[in-house]
From Swiss-Prot:
One of its GO terms (biological process) is valyl-tRNA aminoacylation. Keywords: Aminoacyl-tRNA synthetase, ATP-binding, Coiled coil, Cytoplasm, Ligase, Nucleotide-binding, Protein biosynthesis. This is Valine--tRNA ligase. Monomer. It is an enzyme of class 6 (ligase). CDD domains: Anticodon_Ia_Val, ValRS_core. It is found in: Cytoplasm. ATP binds at K561. It catalyses: tRNA(Val) + L-valine + ATP = L-valyl-tRNA(Val) + AMP + diphosphate. GO terms for molecular function: aminoacyl-tRNA deacylase activity; ATP binding; valine-tRNA ligase activity. Residues 889-918 form a coiled coil. It comes from Blochmanniella pennsylvanica (strain BPEN). It comes from the Bacteria. GO terms for cellular component: cytosol.
Amino acid sequence: MSNYIVEKIYNPKNIEEPIYKFWEYGDYFSPHGNTSQESYCIMMPPPNITGQLHLGHAFQQTIMDVLIRYQRMQGKNTLWQTGTDHAGIATQMLVEHKIYNNTGKTRHDYTRDELIKNIWAWKSQSEQFITYQMKRLGNSVDWKRQRFTMDTEMSYAVTEAFIRLYRKNLIYRGKRLVNWDCKLQTAISDLEVINKKTKGSIWYIYYKLDNATISSNSHHLIVATTRPETMLGDTAVAVHPEDTRYKNYIGQYVIAPITNRRIPIISDKNVDMFKGTGCLKITPAHDFNDYIIGKRHGLPMINIFSLNGKILKKLEVFNSSGQLTDQLYCKIPQIFHNLDSDNARKKIISECNALKLLHNIEPHDLTIPYSDRTGTIIEPMLTDQWYIRVKHLTQHAIDAVNLNIINFVPKQYKNMYFSWMNNLQDWCISRQIWWGHKIPAWYDDNNTIYVGYCEKDIRIKNKLNNNVILHREKDVLDTWFSSSLWTFAALGWPKNTNLLNVFHPTNIIISGFDIIFFWIARMIMLTMHFIKNDNGSAQIPFKTVYITGLIRDELGQKMSKSKGNIIDPIDIIDGISIENLLKKRTKNMLQPQLSKHIINNTIKQFPNGIKPHGTDALRFTLVALASSGRDIHWDMQRLTGYRNFCNKLWHASRFVLMHTKNQDCGISININEKSFSLADRWIITKFHQTVQIFHKKLEIYRFDEIANILHEFIWHQFCDWYLELTKPILYHGNALELRGTRYTLITLLESLLRLTHPIIPFITEKIWQEVKTVTGNNGTTIMLQPFPKYDESVIDMKSVIDIEWIKNAVLAIRTARVNMNISYNIPLQIVFRDTSSEVKKRITENSKILCHIAQLKSIHFISKGTIYPKSMTMPLDSSELLIRIPDTFNKENEINRLKKESELINRKIETIQKLLDDNNFINQAPKSVIKDKQALLNYYELIQNKLIDQCAIMKKL
């Protein structure tokens, strides 16, 4: 780092990777270890090893890095823990897909150990690239503590957690309804289910009454259903207890079509009496709502499907407790055997029609559950699974949020959390796949369950001799189970480690709203169950939950691989050609039929690929877009704007260094031997006001606002105004003035670099290494420098008032130049009329600044009422600003020029307006095109109004 030179051209590619290596080599990311200082810890949500990081990861990780760098510069003992997640189903499916594409083999061509070996190889490759991406993003994580959810220590923690929960009777094995993926042959979580709306039908079927004892002309009930194939598993028909149409039928029986099974008519408040006919067929083994009703009424459950989604030859009947029974007649005609759901439906409707049991069919809007992993329709299936009794864990978790021990940001997500926590069902934690934590359970030949650390441990504990054959549970644990232990297991639990004592509870978790229940709530529940404070009370996993919105593409669509609109952060940092971008987006697609659509959209959005922007521009963009839980529409134009912002900071720093390096900056000289100009005092005041607001906004996690205030200060106050205001002194000042301005330039730049470092770490480190040689700072890295603090003693409000007045005067003069089409190179004569003594003094004292910035020839004062010929008059506070019109100015020519320009703009407005008034265009054009046309119309209308105003001003001259 000794060769730091601020080159003329800002090229992020040349500086970012060397700087990161410098940070790593210096071990600056690790906790400093001084436990007398306050600790601060963030546990990064571990990315899945299913591929690479996308913009959503970059967004959340940038927010985390801003916080950790900020707290590190505050002197806190900081730990940012990183790691990766094994992502059970998703990873196994991905590797199976890759194997099939490369060899034509499926999982069934491998032993379990062989497939697992392939997945570990993929894990190594994927984790390596994810680590590379994190480093390119500038993440200041403690790499020495990088974890994986299936490493040895984490696996031990998972086993320990399972055993402890089982021994407290909080884990059990039972037969319940789950989301079943017939292709993957496993249960999946609700998060892995996508509900899609589609057009379908609703069938109205006659259910004949059996020996009706009621007085009625009807011999049947009409039942409406969208899934007639599940009629084979009906065990009741339910009506609402207050539905007067069916009140007398409650307690009677009907004969189920096809099976001729005698089933009861029951009443239940869950029935919607206004939906269909008000009669609901109950199939507890294949519908979640029916399952709840069935449990409530003690109904038997009939499983009609095999695990691959085909009709069974012999249906399985279970009592309401999930035990096999033969209490119902369950033989069905052979014509239905081994049919899949669609064909079974067609066959059953055909049979009902032949038996004159089909009343009618109506079109109906349906919501069909699909597997996010395979795209197949999810089948509610009755299977043996492992469960956690979560209701026994919820109260502490609810109280922690209710009492604001844990705070949600934004607050509205607190209500979402409560709505889930108050309606919990037992959590299915087993999966029928090979990749994951093996459930530490064994069975003997009598299906007795033994839970322990290993078979040897179980035999010793239960005094089992070698004649007792034990079989290991084949299922693995749900990925969310191990993830829910993340905050404490990654710090060494179940051992009582120093890291656990120092850094737990952690300070903040940053996550998306879609996993508040699947991850956040479960982390809170399990952490508060396992981890206790010194006084024995339950310990929380984190103090704050910061919820981010989703990053959507510029059309507002969710970014996903299937849509082909995911953007790799590295492609934004380094750039990518259109050819390579297309290859990346269409490689290893699970749905290759979408490739043409993806190619067309990509070429339309990025015809020339993506230009390199560097990490700092990406980070600043992400922070600027971080607006309190709202979804983010990615904007390449804003990215380009913030790349320009970094470039402006770079060149402003070069300007400062050119005028301060090897110059007398008065760094070690008494303040009395320096003369600070009005501009110096003003910029110091504005800087400290910015620092004050920065701290306040970061405390409430308004990242978008801290980006905005930094952009405003650096671009407009520091670069546009202060650097210009210093030039008269830098070029014509005396020794004291020069010393004061140079001192302000270099010390303010150094402070400004520290203020912006958490957001744009690379460019600030690069410049700071050069700046520190001027300021005499002996520090090794800006990362460990103190973060700027607000200092009220340097606030000079008079300087703010004076400079704001000067700025307004300059802007008024510049506006006049535009209105009169006078080149900036032509010096102007200006006159102030009716000026107070205070303002006159302000102008006189700062006439050099005014003349320099506004390009003035002279400034004069005249009294109220004095006529000043051939001038343009503009009000400026309580006085009047008169600008002498140059002899070269031709009023008529200028009016004609403005009119011609106005006519041209008007034709453009008419063309666009005609297009927007065309219904065919509105109905057929993409929304993005319509939006662009409307924006262009607004722009031209704004220009037109300005031209009209300028023309009016000209006529008055």
